[in-house]
Amino acid sequence: IKGLIVVALFFGVWMLLSQIDFVKHFRVEEAKSGTEKSLGDIIWNEIEDTETIIFDDSIVNTLDSLLLPICKENGIERDSLKVHIIDKDEVNAFAMPDNHLVVYTGLIKACKNEQALLGVLGHEIAHIEGNHVMKKLSKEIGLSVLLSITTGSNGAVLSEILKTLSSSAYDRSLETEADMQSVKYLLNANIDPRPFADFLYELSLDNELHKYTYWVSTHPESEARAKTILN
């Protein structure tokens, strides 16, 4: 009887699996991946043409050495992250399609210590790892519009995408998720997350730096987020 039950279960599972069009599923996933890569390339090419990119080895290598422990202790392939440093006073960093991570020199200068900087970068890496970037763009721009830009140039749409990525917030739930994931990244790498919370709190205050602080305006309720991290 047991043998018959096992056979029946096997064929039941087999019948269910046979109803799934795996070829179609993988083709859809492959198409999504191709779209994301194309978008990432197009957006980055636009940034390269309009911004000043930092290639100084002393700066690039220092940032890379800071990121290595975060990646190593959290199972993230360092080479999968395409990190770019832009010479700009704005205190900002943002994630882009296809694992691009843009960091402004204004953010690096504003952070009083490495832990604070890594907290911010961990937050953006969490957006990348959680596929939040494409979710955000699909919701705010529209998947059909995103697909159209990969098949032909559209300056207005491209500008809107860049604005969405660099100057608008994610859903509150995704922001909280990214904060908490960043804290996990830090703790797994034996890095104190409290300076990250301190950084959020300081930037939430009304001071001269505030006018350059895009990261706070696109990540609202920084004081409340700081308290959540500390708790």
Which ranges hold each PLM region?
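A Zn2+-metalloprotease active-site environment signal
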Residues: I1-N231
